[in-house]
Every structure is written in C-alpha cells, then in structure tokens.
From Swiss-Prot:
It is found in: Cytoplasm. The gene is metXA. It catalyses: L-homoserine + acetyl-CoA = O-acetyl-L-homoserine + CoA. One of its GO terms (biological process) is homoserine metabolic process. The active site is at S169, D335, H368. Pathway: Amino-acid biosynthesis; L-methionine biosynthesis via de novo pathway; O-acetyl-L-homoserine from L-homoserine: step 1/1. GO terms for molecular function: homoserine O-acetyltransferase activity. Belongs to the AB hydrolase superfamily. MetX family. This is Homoserine O-acetyltransferase. Transfers an acetyl group from acetyl-CoA to L-homoserine, forming acetyl-L-homoserine. Keywords: Acyltransferase, Amino-acid biosynthesis, Cytoplasm, Methionine biosynthesis, Transferase. GO terms for cellular component: cytoplasm.
C-alpha cells in the first residue's frame, strides 16, 4: 500500500534532501522495547512505529524544521500524491515550493498520528502479543500521547527546537499541546481553526459517528479483521455526518442548493435525488477506502478528551505562562465546528500568560474546511507570519 522504509534509531544528516515534493515516499521510524511511549491512560506502548513524510532540506544548524500536524481524517501525505487515492496532497495550498510553508526554504515533517491507519501504530496494527490486529485492545490515546510520539520522532532528526509547529482542527490541538508540553522546543506556532478543549456539541457529533460505526453488524465489536469484513456502512454514515460540520449553510447553498442529481424530476423514492445527497454519499463511500473504522473511534475520542486547562487547575492562561513561543491563531467566520469564540479564548489565555500572539479572523463562507481550501487571505496571513518568524529566527534560504 505504501513504499515504507524502516529507520531504526538512525539520525537524518543535515543537508540531506530526503524527499522531493513530486515523488516522495513514506518512511517509518521504529521504536523498540527500550523506547516505550508513555500514555495518559497509564500504560506504555512498546514496540511502536511512526510513519512520516518529509519535504525539503534540513539546514546545517537544524533551525529550519517545520512540523505539520494533520487533521482528523488526513494523514502524512500533505504535499504529494496520496498512495491510496491517487489524489494530490491534502494541503498543497499551504505546503510546497513557493507556498507559505516553502519547501525550498524549510524542512517539513508530517507524521501519521499514533492511533492512525496510514503506517503508524494503531488499532489496525498487529498486536505482538497475539499476532492479530489490536482492535479494541489498543489503548485509548490522547492528543498529548500523539505529541509525545512526535517528539520522539523529532529526536531522531537531532532537532532540538522546531522553527514552527503548524496544524488545523485536530492538528491545531496538537500545535497547542506542543507549545504547552515542549515550550522550549517550539520557536513559533500556527494554530488554525481549533480549540483548547472540545465542546459538548463536538463531543455529541463524534458520539453520533462512533455509534454509527458500532451499530454496523460488520463492526464485530472491533474484531472485523478476524471476521473478514469491514463496517463500511457505519463508517460511511459517520463520515457523512461529520462532513456536514466541516461545511457551512452558505457553502452548501452555493454549491448545491436544491439542484437535482442527473434528473429533472424527483423519483419519489429514496435514491439520491438531490446533488447534496449524492455528494455526501460519495464522501462516505470514498472515505471507507482509505480509513480504518477503529482508528476513527480512537482519534475522535482523543479529540473529545483534549482539555489543556484541566491540567492547570482549570486556568488556561497558566498553561502558557512564561512561554517564549511566537503564536498566530486563525479562525474563520463561517466555522461552526470551531467558531471564532474558541480562537479568541486561546488568544485571551495567551495574552494573560504574557505570550506574543497575533490573531486573524478570516471572513469566508467556506466553513471549517476553509483552512484546507484556496482561501487567499488565510494563505497571505500564514505566509506573513512564517516570514516574520523566519526573520526573527535568522533563517535564510534552505541549503541544497
């Protein structure tokens, strides 16, 4: 499924151009019994592995590294053709030569999160104790667990301090967690369309999706691999419901309205008469070809558990007190999944903690997914922030 190369403890040399944007291949960093991953649930995961992509060149002093943290249903293939779908990378609007995250200037790393299903250890991986897929025996993971695993990967490169950590949605949660857990290792942080904790509404939407998966008879209590089946129907419904939250009423009206799908009159049946119905069915059916159902359960649960203030006596500002990281927080006016009020709460906490922070609210009708789309104002803001941070960091052009 992927061209994966094992990297057992070896470090990447500065100046080595590990991947070209046009023809990259995934790498896997393996961590043995001597390098367990401590999890918030109280156990250690060992052995485990992290699949990742890199783009660009790590400079001599390793000061130009950007970690991109992917969103819930994305993976490490942000700027290359996806090995399963054959589609372009998931964040080409932001990552690539001449883009805001300029791969001619920066060394870019993106790893599949722990619990994911594109090469990193997750519930679809083989449990070494049983020789079968982990299924629900896989430990429940959290956003902090994901970040600890990423930090172990960054150590493999010998990178002490990341120039920037960037991410949107679940990726933005990881950005914030990086800045709290490893403030001395993050020079700048770009947190997009996210929050410091999941709202009751978002937890409710996630529970709807999880119940759709678990209600599918083919889910088999998470043991579907052993039964030779897959809960396609349940996962497709979960994706359809979630995808609605990524859009906006205005965007749906502009794109579909009440237009019919390949017909002029209703069929008076339960076929997909409307274009929006056909679109959602496509989103569901295509998603199940590239995503594991149990991973969906685990990653949505990780987002639900996320709450930075909970570890600081309920005082969010305390989490950021004394940080030297430069922050940029971005929200979108039509994002009702992570509304601007959530971003303002982040900014207020950063200000109270004495952090350097800039904030932008982008006026758009594209909804939550605006951060993945061609949104010129957002792209300009990301570029300006990274250029300013790069000047402060003393970065020139990447060495080739």
């Amino acid at each position: 499924m992927m061209n994966i190369h094992s990297v057992k403890g070896q470090k990447i040399a500065a100046g080595e151009r590990t991947q070209e944007v046009d023809h990259p291949h995934s790498l896997v960093a393996q961590f043995g019994a001597d390098q367990p991953l401590p999890l918030d649930c109280g156990i250690e995961l060992s052995p485990f592995q992290i699949a990742y992509q890199t783009y660009g060149t790590l400079n001599a002093d390793k000061s130009n590294a950007i970690l991109v943290c992917h969103a819930l249903t994305m993976d490490q293939h942000i700027a290359n053709v996806h090995p399963i779908t054959g589609k372009p990378g998931g964040w080409l609007t932001l990552v690539g030569p001449g883009k805001p995250i300029d791969t001619d200037r920066y060394f870019v790393i993106c790893s599949n999160v722990i619990g994911g299903c594109m090469g990193s250890t997750g519930p679809a991986s083989i449990n070494p104790a049983t020789g079968k897929a982990w299924g629900l025996d896989f430990p429940v993971i959290t956003i902090p667990d994901m970040v600890r695993a990423q930090a172990m990967l960054i150590d493999r490169f010998g990178i002490d301090k990341l120039f920037c950590v960037v991410g949107g949605s679940m990726g933005g949660m990881q950005v914030l967690q990086w800045s709290v857990a490893f403030p001395e290792r993050v020079f700048s942080a770009l947190a997009i369309a996210c929050a410091t904790r999941h709202s009751a509404q978002n937890i409710a939407f996630h529970e709807l999706g999880r119940q759709a998966v678990m209600a599918d008879p083919d889910w088999q209590h998470g043991r579907y691999f052993e039964h030779g089946c897959f809960p396609h129907r349940g996962l497709a419904v979960a994706r359809m419901a979630a995808h609605i939250t990524y859009l906006s009423d205005a965007a749906l009206h502009r794109k579909f309205g009440r237009k019919m799908q390949d017909r002029e009159l209703p069929t008076f049946s339960f076929d997909a008469d409307f274009q929006v119905e056909s679109y959602l069915r496509y989103q569901g059916s295509s998603f199940v070809e590239r995503f594991d159902a149990n991973s969906y359960l685990y990653l949505t649960r990780a987002m639900d558990y996320f709450d930075i203030a909970a570890d600081h006596d309920g005082v969010l500002a305390a989490a950021f007190r004394g940080t030297q990281t430069r922050f940029c927080v971005v929200s979108f006016t039509s994002d009702w999944l992570f509304p601007t009020s959530e971003s303002r709460a982040i900014v207020h906490a950063l200000n109270a903690g004495g952090a350097r922070v800039s904030f932008a609210e982008i006026v758009t009708d594209k909804g939550h997914d605006a951060f993945l789309l061609d949104e010129p104002e957002f792209i300009d803001i990301a570029r300006a922030f990274l250029q300013s941070a790069g000047t402060a960091r003393g970065l020139g052009k990447a060495e080739h």
